[in-house]
Amino acid sequence: MIKRNLLLILLTGLIGIAVLNASTPDEQINTISDINNGIEVGSLKQLNSISFDQIKTDYIILNLWASWCIPCQNEVEELLKISEESNITVIGILVDDSVSNGREFIKDNKIPYKNILKEEESDIVLSQFNWTGIPTTLILDSNLLILHTLNGEITANEIIELTK
């Protein structure tokens, strides 16, 4: 009898844990980290592919992506909304992918915002902060200081909320 009750308690506990940890495909899964807060990404000014003198927005989004990354593909529409409908500059950084794949992805998705495709340039930028995978999105202020680091797929509303 005691063994049966103990087994039922354990089984109930395992089911409870499984239910709490279950996620649906539509569920947003990302984390906001403060690990990089306050780090200046000054190396962006050294890049030939981006002219920072022309950026007049209060915030800059750096989005680390690859063409083969499903969450990166999913968030393209959200990044397009941010770049077109808000006063936020979006810059993509190609990671762990070829330049030709990156160019094809940009063309296929009609991405108008700037992207850093060359590995030499992206390595210079990526060495300045901590990141663990893609997609990773960083919110910078106009002085290129990191305010937020988001690991995982993002939404436009989430970014807008964090930049209020």
Label every PLM stretch briefly.
Residues 74, 84, 89-121, 134:
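Conserved segment of the thioredoxin-like fold in thiol-based oxidoreductases
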Residues 76, 80, 99-106, 126, ...:
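Extracytoplasmic/secreted envelope proteins and their assembly/folding machinery
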Residues 40, 65, 91:
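Conserved Rossmann-like nucleotide-binding pocket used by diverse enzymes
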Residues 58-60, 64-68, 133:
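Short pre-active-site segment immediately N-terminal to redox-active cysteine/selenocysteine motifs
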Residues 38-60, 126:
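A short beta-strand-turn-helix
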Residues 64-81:
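Conserved redox-active cysteine motifs that mediate thiol-disulfide chemistry
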Residues 1-43, 164:
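N-terminal targeting signals for export/organelle localization
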Residues 108-111, 118-163:
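Thiol/disulfide oxidoreductase modules built on the thioredoxin-like
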